[in-house]
Amino acid sequence: MEPEELTIEWYEENGLEKPIHFRCDPTRIGMKLPSPSTFTVDSVLELVGGNRMIEVVQVEDQGSVKMTLEEFVEFYKTPRDQRKNLYNVLSLEYSLTPLEDLVNSPALVRQIDWVGNIWPDALRQRWISFNGREKKSYFPHHTFPKVQNYCLMSVANCYTDFHIDFSGTSVWYHVLKGRKVFWLIPPTATNFFIYQEFIKTVSDNAFFGRSVEACHVAVLEPGDTMLIPSGWIHAVYTPDDSLVFGGNFLHSLSCQTQLRVYQVENKLNITRKFRLPYNEELLFYVMADYVKKWTGREYVRPLLVEDAKLDYVGEKWKAAGGHLKKIRFEDYNVEVTSEMVKNEEESEKDEVKVIAMHAGSSNYDNAMISKMSYTEATGLEEEAEDEDVKPETKKEAEERRDAEIDLLAATNSLIFYRNSKHDFIRNKSVPDHKLPIGHEPPVYFNDEEVSRISPRLLEELEALGAYIRRKNRVEVAEGICHPASLINLFNTVLKKRRAELTGKPFQFNQIMPRRYTRAAIETGDYDFEPVRTIEDSRRASQFKVEDFPDELLESDEPDETSRIHLPHQPSSGPLEYIPTPRGEIRENSLGFEPEYDEDMEEYDPAEQVVKEELEEEEEEEEGEEEEEEEYVAPVTRRSSTRGSASTKEEPQEEKEEKEAAPKKEKKEKKVKKEKSSKPEKDTTEAKLKKEKKKKEMERRLRDSELEAELRAAHGGKNAKSKKKPEKPAYVGGLPTAPIQNDPVVSNPYNYDPRMEMMKLGTGQLKSAYRKTKANVELHIEKNLYKLEPKRDESESREPSMEHEDSPTTPHAPYDRYSHYHTENSHFQEDQDSHRTPAKRSKYDNISVDTSESPHIPKKRSLEGRPSPYSVISPPHNRPKLSSPAMFSPSSEPRRSNDRRTSDPAVNAMKKGVYMPPMSRQDKMIAEAASASSSRHSSFSERRPSFIPDLNSSRHSSTDTPMYTPTAPARSSWLPNTSNVTRHSLDDDSPIDVVSESPIDVLNSPPFPRSITPPPVSLSELKSQSNGRKSNYSEDGKRAKIPAREAVAELKTLIGKLKTLNEA
């Protein structure tokens, strides 16, 4: 492009998206530069000052070294072959020095630069730190983004690796001497991601240009100028010794890229030293500047030079020639405290530092001097001071300026700033930009300025507004007191412009003005008068008082009867609560306003107290009469204050009317006595009366109905007040159901809410949110029960009783299948098998039928063992047992009330506690698995009826006659269960179902039934093993089998049990 085309119009239309290389006279693009033939590094040393400390890049490791400018110039002048190290100066900012008058950036850059055009001039301040014992060298620190002008001095073979300029700033670059080679990479999303990974790998020495999508090369010769857009990744190589001028700037048409780079810096945790200072404060100033153009509102307080806390170096200072003066330690005699610069960068630990600023008597610090006097070196004439002017103290000047700002903000609705006391803390992030906005005056848009927002600019500014709104904490700039209102209005204008470009209607939600109370309007405690709306004008009367004659107007005298005056409320919006004074509220003892007729005389609180006492006496007398009534209903508040209707017949009503007549006479007499005994009211007596009334009210509040209910709930009694009898309440002519004290449904968990309450002042109620052992676990007896027949008394005794009998009467262990039962005992055992099981320990092993006698292995005779399908003999033909140990009167089960009452399960059932039983399948698996471990228990115990006794063959004797178990006769109401095909020959399940009688079903508790399995012989198990090796030896002992076979056998048993349960 031609140099003359680089204008503001071209910029607004195209923006800065690609690098622009100009090889022309720099004056054609609005630049100002010294002559290359006469300007050298010695000129820089003379104009800037040799005692200025600079940070130099060490090319070998891309580190940094500090040295004075004079030391670097000496290194620069050394011959090329004598340089041991390569140093590169990239951070010599020459603003506020005489060199600034010789070099100017391109005209377009100066027009669009945010820092040069928007940053407040009064906030351009600095402070200087002097180093060394002699205080010759110094380092300047600035309180604004000072990045506009740089002088870059590089020796040959210097290289700067790939980087993005801080905060996404754009760069202008002019080569005065030497050459520069640039590698440029566009800021695409892919390249940004690769660059972040490149920054993280510090030890990577590979050339980054080969890892990206595209990389461009540009060679700048002496006299060339280039503009590098925001976000472009670039590296620079210096083939010859060079002297370059450049600078960084931020502008509006690169907001998205600038914010993206700023976020990448936050993500990579780049130190403050290598970032743009005061970036977020600058964003607030930019938004405030746009809002002022679009709406006329001013959000930035005009800052004064006199308010500068540090050394002012703004435009007025430069116009006075302050930048021409050399910096020397002798000119600074005021030290700056560490609190003033605690957030600034600190120098090295080993250097000697003295922080100083201009003296108080300096030419740039006195606010009362309109024209400053200068030395002879400046060439300006001195002006005599006015003798009549009296100096004003600093405190008086601050108070005067604050009063002026407050007056301006109160009178002008476009002023949205306050005095300096409302400023935010400097360099501290706050979330105040997300506070609610509140009331605001109407917004007036400048349509001419709003229409200048191009689609390109609108997209960039929308990204800026969205970023500030989403950020949790921001650094609010000095002078801005309403950041939330500023952000809201900035985004509102952008929405309006977006609606205009898209052709959609714009709906602006104007924030309603605050509804002021009458007190605020009378005292003037408001910012501006509320605008009168149409609704208010509708409510206003169309006629005036002067239009009516006096005869038609009401008298101004106040009415005798007190009226309730409602406050004036708007027709829309929330109603305001105007509290009524405490003295105007009349309450009775219960805290409610008493009801009285409109035609009654003036309200007297003493008379009301007497009436209440009389009503209480009446109610007590009525309660004594009504104690004989049968029906008593709970008391309601309405029924207690008003007289309840009597439910008696007409003769009783007539009696009540007769009794009521003398009561009225008593009331009138008491009231007359009280009135006659009243003395004349004096001031002291009135005060005493008020105090007495307050004490009486407090006493009655303490003894109120609420406190009585609380005491009753806590178990206490109200000793002061007499309990009144409960009266029936009627709703719609029918009596309500009385409230039951006891719960209708039984409490299954034994939870008593009254036990959770405690008296006030004695402790703290249990928290519903704090999980503790007390409020999580229920107090229930955690006992596991097994369903098994009831044991007799001999079996429930201690094991020592059995040990005494075992040596005298050696016998085989108890075999349930060989036991002889009479008809009654069989029925009785069947009944007991359905009773509540006895309490069993949680970890008790399942015992088997063993005894302490020595085990004599014998073969069981299988001749007398019936098959499952053999004919069952009747019960009266059963043979008697020959062994006395197998059957004894003490071992016969019998029904006893003591056992039923002492059974913990029965007690638990009476209490209403549900004890969940184990499933039948789980019990069978558990007992089958633990049968081998409990074979040699210390005492004999009956096996549960649903577990087959597979090992009983090794204890049975051949001499013991076998019995044939019988099933009860099938009743007519039961299905046919005696079918011989119920268990086929292939089914090896040892479990059968014993049918029940109707009486057993009706009387049995809701517990699982015990099932008596049919007898199973060892031969049957061997025949049903499908050719598999038997697990039992000839002597009846269980042989050891592999674990896999045991698991497989257990699985088959479980499967068969499941099929039986499903059937």
UniProtKB/Swiss-Prot annotation:
Composition-biased stretches, type Pro residues, lie in 1005-1016
Please give the record's comment on domains. Answer: The JmjC domain mediates the demethylation activity.
Positions of the UniProt region annotated as Disordered: 379-400, 554-750, 776-1040
Biased composition (Basic and acidic residues) is annotated at 390-400, 647-665, 674-712, 776-806, 813-835, 892-902, 1031-1040
Give GO BP annotations, semicolon-separated: chromatin remodeling; regulation of transcription by RNA polymerase II
**Name recorded for this polypeptide:** JmjC domain-containing histone demethylation protein 1
Recorded hits in Gene3D superfamilies, A to Z, give: Cupin
Q: Which GO terms describe its molecular function?
A: histone demethylase activity; histone H3K36me/H3K36me2 demethylase activity; metal ion binding; transcription coregulator activity
The record's InterPro entries line, in alphabetical order, gives: Cupin_8, JHDM1_Histone_Demethylase, JmjC_dom
Q: Which Pfam family is one of this chain's hits?
A: Cupin_8
> Biased composition, Low complexity: where in the chain?
636-646, 926-937
Per the record, the similarity remark reads:
Belongs to the JHDM1 histone demethylase family.
Which intervals hold domain JmjC? 86-266
According to the UniProt entry, which residue ranges have a biased composition of type Acidic residues?
379-389, 594-605, 613-631
Polar residues bias (residue ranges): 950-963, 973-982, 1020-1030
Q: Which residues bind substrate?
A: T160, K180
This protein's cofactor list reads: Fe(2+)
Which cysteines share a disulfide bond?
Answer: none
